[in-house]
Every structure is written in C-alpha cells, then in structure tokens.
Amino acid sequence: MKRQKGFTLIELLIVVAIIGIIAAIAIPNLLNAINRGRQKRTMADIRSIATAIESYSVDYNFYPRQGDGVIGDITPFVVPTYIKKMPDADGWNNGIQWYGDTLGVSYTVYSYGKGGGADTTWINGRTTDFASDIVYAEGQFYQWPEGMQIN
C-alpha cells in the first residue's frame, strides 16, 4: 500500500491553535503600542501649538483673543509666524480643542483622547486611560497620560 503525503487533521489543528495563541498575545500589545504612539503625537502637537501661543503672547502681551472652539479658530493669530502648519486633529483624528477668553489672559488646548468626548472633569495630574482628555493650560500639561494605559 502506498502512503499518501500531506498533513493530518490533528497536525493542522495544532498549527492553527498555535497561531491563535500567538495572535491573542500579539494583537493587544500592538493595539496598545498604536494608541501610545497616538498619545505621544497628540502631546507633541499640543506642545507645538502652546509654544506658538506663548510666542504670540511675547510679541503682543496677551494670548489670542478668541473664545472656545476648535484649534483652527486661532490659526490666523499664529500661522505662519509662530507655527508653520496648525495641526487640526489629534492622533485619533478628533479635532484639537481650544478654550480661551476674549481678554487674552488665559488659554487651554486639549484633546478628547481616544474616547472622542469630553471628560466630565479634569484632574490635575496623570491619567491611565487612553480615553481621558489630554489638557495643556497656560504653560504646562494639566492632565496627561502616564504609565500603563487601559482601554
């Protein structure tokens, strides 16, 4: 009797199970790394915007006099003199937000984070949730991601 060449069903099932185990370990780590990269990009963009706003205030002795809205609202004040191109979206493709006053004495630049919606309150310090807002106010981060992230 001639023996047929090929893999048995058991061998194929074992290979599929091993691939499934590897995927179960690798995919969450990959998604975490992608979200971490989006956070870092968002923080860098917010820091660049804040630097442009601070440079504007050095020249004019006040921050841009513009109410709250999306960051594009202050583009005429800072582009191209203080920043070459205004980033209009964060790492999750949500609009970067601006909160200012009409007197030009304060400002806040923030991202809604992965969740895409505003937090009910901001904490002064670090967060461990990708969905938390990233907040920069008057020269420093007020709420920022740090450490092991969830969600």
What are these regions (language model features)?
Residues 2-31:
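N-terminal single-pass transmembrane signal-anchor helix
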Residues 11, 45, 90:
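Acidic active-site catalytic centers that drive phospho-/nucleotidyl reactions
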Residues 29-46:
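Aliphatic-rich helix starts adjacent to a transmembrane/signal segment
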Residues 42, 59, 120-122:
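Short, solvent-exposed loop/turn and secondary-structure capping segments
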Residues 51-54, 58-108:
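Extracellular/periplasmic head regions of type IV pilus-like filament subunits
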